[in-house]
């Protein structure tokens, strides 16, 4: 394979495919109405904005978003917020919903099948390289560095990887690599993840980011679709096949992580559980967060609603609304309440005499007067009645709402309706 003549050539011969059709069942009721990449994050963003922004900032401007499960809010968000690329310059973000495009008339049966069913579109774009991305992780990464590493190493497939605590690796593909970063073993979501040599408590996990030579990817997908014993999945089928019969190279996240502070540990989060989602949101409210949303050299783009500025006001008794270590978005009004280490999304209203800590409030949440809330995620559009207390009585919380083993409480409109019906 010839090395591209320039970085510009590399960027213009790469197609990024963002997989955004999964149910996200580990997020519980939070994904009952929306696909996981469409879930709000960090106050003003959607989860998918991080993968799309990475593409844009990396100079990769030919992007496809593959959708299936409850995709309406995701499709609307991408159409409204990401329609600024110029087709006349061969820039685009295409939406590829499941359409039963191939013989057999079935929906996407797995991540690999989702790409296979769009092979005719991919071939018409004529990329040299295809970057396959999960649309549900939080991180900043220069994909062009990874593509360049792929080309320079003469790999058939390059797999993004990161070191994680061994027992957390049960949710990921786990890799073995040799001294030259060649992948020699790969197992998807093992019950007992193998440790890295010399590091018994650490495993090398796949980030769900792959770079393929386009022609090689086509042949892999065409072979996979005819296999009897297959889940049509990249992690379960395609990557193990490359490891055994091709040249798969590991690409450590540290090689292409984008950070405004090189001394900070590379930040990547799978927000696939309520606990992880809550913690990653609150990471952003830290004094010096590991993920810098204020880096003008690598901005996170999103749909910008036209909203009034946030404000803190005194209530009728003169009590001042205050907040520390928190993110507050446009349209928010905080009246005479104390809030700490929290994320308030757009159009959140907090009435007087409340005490709120370690809370993630999604858009259009309204908090009644005299509420005490701690360690909560409150879904979009919920109204919390006056005097509500959450986060102080584990038994009571579990009876009323979805509560994780670590004590994070998810409040949804459906759960609130059940309370009023009793």
Swiss-Prot record:
Ligand binding (alpha-D-glucose 1-phosphate): 108, 173, 188-189, 206
Xref: SUPFAM superfamilies: Nucleotide-diphospho-sugar transferases, Trimeric LpxA-like enzymes
Source organism, top-level taxon: Bacteria
Disulphide-bonded residues: none
Presence of the UniProt keyword ATP-binding in the record: yes
GO biological process, one term: glycogen biosynthetic process
E.C. number: 2.7.7.27
MF terms (GO), sorted A to Z: ATP binding; glucose-1-phosphate adenylyltransferase activity
Pathway: Glycan biosynthesis; glycogen biosynthesis
Keyword vocabulary terms for this entry: ATP-binding, Carbohydrate metabolism, Glycogen biosynthesis, Glycogen metabolism, Nucleotide-binding, Nucleotidyltransferase, Transferase
Catalytic activity field: alpha-D-glucose 1-phosphate + ATP + H(+) = ADP-alpha-D-glucose + diphosphate
Gene3D superfamilies listed in its UniProt record: Hexapeptide repeat proteins, Spore Coat Polysaccharide Biosynthesis Protein SpsA, Chain A
Pfam families membership: Hexapep_GlmU, NTP_transferase
Role, per record: Involved in the biosynthesis of ADP-glucose, a building block required for the elongation reactions to produce glycogen. Catalyzes the reaction between ATP and alpha-D-glucose 1-phosphate (G1P) to produce pyrophosphate and ADP-Glc.
Family: Belongs to the bacterial/plant glucose-1-phosphate adenylyltransferase family.
Assembly description: Homotetramer.
Protein known as: Glucose-1-phosphate adenylyltransferase
Organism from which the protein derives: Paraburkholderia phymatum (strain DSM 17167 / CIP 108236 / LMG 21445 / STM815) (Burkholderia phymatum)
Gene: glgC
